[in-house]
Amino acid sequence: MRQRPPFIVSASDLPEHSHAYPQSDEPMGPSRRLGAAAGLVRLGINLQRLPPGTRSSWPHAESDEEEFVYVIEGAVDAWIDGTLHRMVAGDLAAFPAGTGICHCFINNSDREALLLAGGEAAKAVNRIVYPVNPSRRVDLKESDWWHDAPARELGGHDGLPDALRPRKDI
């Protein structure tokens, strides 16, 4: 059998990477960097696993990088500008650059979810804003913070998975 070219990769052959934001011990859902492994440099494509009670990232918006998330398996809550929207397998959410649409994905279900997340790879001109976590600004270079992000009204949800809230029945 012929060896496959390096731009054909199998997700199962790639390590999972997980991260937590500085000054936080909350792990974000682990992902496999498919695009980078296949040699893409201008497009990031990640296979992200969201166990119950986790989220993809902190709520954020980007100035110059388009992003998308496609639900492969399970169900997640798309946190869009402070309001939750249920997404199931086959649903896609797209975030055009510069709109200021703040987003993250939360697994409040009791089953694991699998997402395909993609977007333009780190552009030097891109800026980011974390409206629910303004303390994140101190972890970034001043030039990386999106100071003039479009003002968008935020709903009442705080962007946290239900599992991170104190239980009321105790």
Label every PLM stretch briefly:
Residues 1-42, 128-170:
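A short, N-terminal "cap"/entry segment at the start of jelly-roll beta-barrel domains
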Residues 28-33, 46-62, 100:
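Conserved short histidine dyad/triad with adjacent acidic residue
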Residues 30, 41-46, 65-67, 74, ...:
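A generic structural signal for short beta-strands and their flanking turns/coil linkers
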Residues 47-51, 61-79, 118-121:
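Short, conserved beta-strand element in jelly-roll/cupin
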Residues 74-76, 90, 105:
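Short hydrophobic/aromatic patches on the structural cores and recognition surfaces of FHA
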